[in-house]
Structures are given as C-alpha cells and as structure tokens.
Amino acid sequence: IRDSGSAAARAGVDLPDAEHLFDGDSHLLRALEESLDEANTLAIMRQNQVLPEGSHGLAYIKATGFGYLEYALEDPIGFVALIEVSSRSIVPVSFDETGETEQPFDMGKAFTFIMNLVRDAISESNGPRSPWILFTQIAALWASIHGLSQLSTVGALRYHSANFYFNLASKVMDIILQGMVNVLELKRPD
C-alpha cells in the first residue's frame, strides 16, 4: 500500500478519481492514514472506558493494548493499511511533552495516547523522567501488541478465536508491564 494505486484499490475508488479528490497521492495517503488512525484510537478509547475511574496507569496501558488488538481484529485490512501508510514520528522530544506543542512531527492520535499513558504511569510511580526511557517503554509496548496483532490478523495465529487472542494479549501485556515495573523500579498498584 506504499503507493496511492494500492490505497485507492483497497478503498474501491479509481486512482484518477482518488488523486483528483485529494489533490495528488500524498494527500490521499495522509487522509487514509488519519482516518485509519482515528479508527484505531476509537478502539483504544473503548477499551479504556471500561476501567473504573482512578485505575492505575498500568491498567490503562493494558487496556490500550486490548484496544489496539480490537482494532486489528475488527478491521484487519485497515490495520495492515495503517501500518503501510504510517508516516509519523514515534520518538518523543521530551518526557513532559504531551504531543501537542513541542513535538516537531505529528505522532498521530493513537500513538500520542499510548505515549501519554506510558509517561503518566512512569510519573505516577515516580519513575525516571527521561525521553529515552519513555521512548524505549513505548517501543516495547507497541512492538509487543503490534506483533501479536499482526500474528492474529495476517500471521500464523489468524485462525483462532477472539477469546484466544485476548487471553494471549493479556499474558503478553502482563509480561511487558512487569518488565516495565522491574526495569524502572515502578510501584505496582495494591
């Protein structure tokens, strides 16, 4: 999907029509990326909304992983397309930046949401306030749930049930979160 022809074909639109509507292929790809990122963010938000008010930041991170997987399972083509057309930065410029002002490159809604949750969980537990630490924890979290989502939608695990995927995701997220707690010496919720 790196080219606009593939993106237009997946959308069921002729390439000349798509390019005309979006003033060239770069605008088409950016609009596709924003639309798919919005769908991913909505799935993440749905999973986070089921948590009780005041839950520990680590619980929100786990719910975010479930939301990412939910999006991949609900729209596997959109999930793969989002990854193919992603053009945004995933590196935070500072620990305290929320993705709104200092960030020279748009991270996208879903990735900004993940970054903010990880930062908040680190802060909540008095962990180290370093952009590098923040980035490595985001990368570990994203890579783990993204890998599982890939395996579940287009990979070797694609023929299992949703229960299987979410049970496996729960275990994967628990391992990642425990690693985060151990490496950063964070406080676990009571």
Model-based region annotation:
Residues 4, 8:
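The alpha-helix within a helix-turn-helix
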Residues 55, 89-124, 135-139, 166-181:
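Amphipathic alpha-helical packing segments from all-alpha helical-bundle domains
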Residues 62-91, 111-115, 145, 149:
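Helical hydrophobic small-molecule/effector-binding pocket
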Residues 80-83, 90-91, 127-130, 154-161, ...:
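Short, hydrophobic secondary-structure boundary micro-motifs
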Residues 1, 15, 19-45, 62, ...:
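An amphipathic alpha-helix adjacent to DNA-recognition modules
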Residues 10-14:
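Short coil turns linking two alpha-helices in DNA-binding domains
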Residues 31, 35, 45-77, 105-109, ...:
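Hydrophobic alpha-helical connector segments
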Residues 74, 120, 124, 141-160, ...:
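Amphipathic C-terminal alpha-helical segment
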